[in-house]
Amino acid sequence: MVGEKLVAYMLVSVLGLALLRSVFGQHMPEEPCSVQILVPGLKGEAGEKGEKGAPGRPGRVGPTGEQGPPGDKGQKGSPGRYGKMGPTGPKGLKGDMGDPGPKGPNGEPGVPCECAPLRKMIGEMDIQVVQLTNELKFIKNAVAGIKETDSKVYLLVKEEKRYREAEVFCQGRGGHLAMPKDAAANRAIAGYVTDAGLSRVYIGINDLEREGHFVYVERSPMTTFSRWREGEPNNAYDDEDCVEMVSSGEWIDVACQLTMYFVCEFDKDTV
């Protein structure tokens, strides 16, 4: 490529001289002249590597790359601040009635009084009590169908209540839920239930204070007598702490929140 350029340059120079000679040949003296032809030299050897140049300007932003795979799951962060208190929830159901409280201390002695009028009044009241007692016996036997043994009076209450409510009802009338402590009492209560056409009633036995340790409702321990149905007590669902009697006289442990009829027991000498 360089050689071709050199030949072309020489031809142009010769043609230029020939043209000058033809134009100005008559007037030019024939004196010798020198012609200098400048010919580019050959390519030199490569020089030494120069110093590192300054950084160029930032290039254009390249196209967006493909989405990379998800990174590893980060560590669990620290708990945030407590949020605002939520709205007040609905009012809950009324709970069961609690056990009766302990007996309070005796009151202060009364002031002295004239007792003669009171004795007369008490005598008159005793007469009325005798009359009322006779009337009550009639009601027991003829209307209410109350059952009696040598020492106990049993009252069947045909009003469905939970266990604790039933015991409070009996206590409010001077008694407790029926506590069959021997075979005779158990037969009397079972016969009462059968005669009334019922299938089951609450009786005064539970293990509310210690699971599996059944006691009578007035907290006296059970001794030798029991009438559990086969497979009972089984504490099904871990929620059977009270006892029912079925018409056959057998006992079954049941949940205390069930509602059913019940039998109250009273000492005969207090009725």
Curated annotation (Swiss-Prot):
Record's signal peptide: 1-25
GO molecular function, one term: fucose binding
Keywords of the record: Calcium, Coiled coil, Collagen, Developmental protein, Disulfide bond, Immunity, Innate immunity, Lectin, Mannose-binding, Metal-binding, Secreted, Signal
Binding residues annotated for a carbohydrate, in chain numbering: R200, E240, E244, I252, D253, V254
Entries under PROSITE patterns matching the protein: C_TYPE_LECTIN_1, C_TYPE_LECTIN_2
Residue ranges of the region described as Disordered: 46-112
A Gene Ontology biological process term: neural crest cell migration
Entry keyword annotation includes Metal-binding: yes
UniProt KW Calcium keyword: yes
Subcellular location: Secreted
Major location (coarse): secreted
Residues the entry annotates as binding Ca(2+) 1: D207, E211, N235, E240, D241
Domain C-type lectin: 149-265
GO cellular component term of the entry, any: extracellular space
Occurrences of domain Collagen-like (ranges): 44-103
Family named by the database record: Belongs to the COLEC10/COLEC11 family.
Name used for this protein in its record: Collectin-11
Organism: Danio rerio
